[in-house]
């Protein structure tokens, strides 16, 4: 029996830096990222670029993922808005800023935010303030209402609600909470 030398690692398979192989590596990396949570095309593009993948490889991989429906910025934006509005209590401005940071197109952002009407946004703000006011110590000292109003309006502003809505909601809810505590 004749013995052949062991093949060297360079002869054992395709070149790991070859274009098709790099594309498969990039595809596998994207799939790993997508198992954790949905991501936008821009987020995946940034991650691949960070890893040193060339632009043509990135474009082909992302086009493939979009084609099979694994990457859909419109669906991502709608789910993000629904989730962050409902569970985190974010207002339209904060949601728009978050989606912009994630690389979602402005048209997609405005269409996904159209699902939130002003009444629903106000209801969510009222609920947030009401819940927070129940835990708040309300003094009868002069000026204490101003401190509470500032704190509550600041909380709503950080969550992306407009200043006028925040002040209106806080004023109404604070009066309601004071009345509730008197009874």
From Swiss-Prot:
User: What's any one GO cellular component for it?
Assistant: cytoplasm
Cytoplasm listed as a keyword? yes
Where is the sequence biased in composition, kind Polar residues? 1-12
Q: Where is this region: Disordered?
A: 1-26
Any Pfam family: RecX_HTH2
**Superkingdom, taxonomy of origin:** Bacteria
Question: Briefly, what is this protein's role?
Answer: Modulates RecA activity.
The protein in question is named: Regulatory protein RecX
Q: Which organism is it from?
A: Mycobacterium sp. (strain JLS)
